[in-house]
Amino acid sequence: MNWDDLRVVAAINRCGSFNRAAKMLNVEETTIARRLARLEGSLGCVLFQAVDGQRRPTEQCRALLQPLVLMEQAAEAITLQLERQERPLRNFRLTTIDAIAQHYLAPTLADLLIAEPELSLQLETSDDNVDMARWHADIAIRLGRPRRGNFTMRRVGEMRFNLVLPRGAAPEDLVLAAYPDPLMEVPEMQDFQQYFPGRQARLRSANLRVIRVLVDSGRAAAVLPDFLSVDLVGDERFQVHRLPARREIWLLAQPHLRDDPLARRVTNWCADLFAETLAGDAV
């Protein structure tokens, strides 16, 4: 008795015919009949009878089916384990800004890694745009369209911004929070400076969550992206003003990954995270 013969029994039981069982196992119908006859000969009993054009298991066959199912499940588990052991991990380096990593990527990272057991992801955050030409990253998510470069790129989303300040506070009494000096030329900071011309920020940070905590104190004014401020819309403690500034979200990948199935699944996962940002305004 061998495992291939037992698999034939399981297939015939599932499919109800030699022909469909052969297609399921990707063998010839004559092979199915031969293996079944060999097994019936070794057991000394008939395992299937033809009833109304279907192959129905006999009583002796039904006695075999439950342990046979357990054997199939064990074989599948062993095969899966061996495949995982034999499949080498592939490391991709993904870079983006801290806020995107925390808000968009982190909540579903576990789902991605479980779905892709061969994937090892090195996630790095930086306020500076990485140099893809120097292979500082395999995949990058950045704000603003790259001017040039030897990489694939696609626009996957859009980031909108709100000015948030405590309701009823005098402008001169507000603590202003803004980005560090090197980032003051970005569109949202230009809008911010139009609201408070000539005023100097008392806090400068690229960490948007730190700025959000300061805003929550009720003593500060700052610019925050939608995903960190939309919950304040309708909060009587705050005024939330939509700013004209928009920042496009771009997904970049090294050119050699264009036709790589795993890389494509990772980049599609990234793109899907931002789909709602293109659907409409939150405020």
From Swiss-Prot:
Keywords: Activator, DNA-binding, Transcription, Transcription regulation
InterPro entries attached to this UniProt entry: LTTR, LysR_subst-bd, Tscrpt_reg_HTH_LysR, WH-like_DNA-bd_sf, WH_DNA-bd_sf
UniProt-listed Gene3D superfamilies: Periplasmic binding protein-like II, Winged helix-like DNA-binding domain superfamily/Winged helix DNA-binding domain
Pfam families given in the database record: HTH_1, LysR_substrate
Residue ranges constituting the HTH lysR-type domain according to the UniProt record: 1-58
The UniProt record lists the keyword Nucleus: no
DNA-binding region(s), chain positions: 18-37
Coiled coil regions in record: none
GO molecular function terms noted in the UniProt entry: DNA binding; DNA-binding transcription factor activity
Chain ranges passing through the membrane: none
Disulfide bonds: none
Function: Transcriptional activator of the mau genes involved in methylamine metabolism.
Family in the record: Belongs to the LysR transcriptional regulatory family.
Protein name: Mau operon transcriptional activator
Phylogenetic lineage: Bacteria, Pseudomonadati, Pseudomonadota, Alphaproteobacteria, Rhodobacterales
Gene expressing this chain: mauR
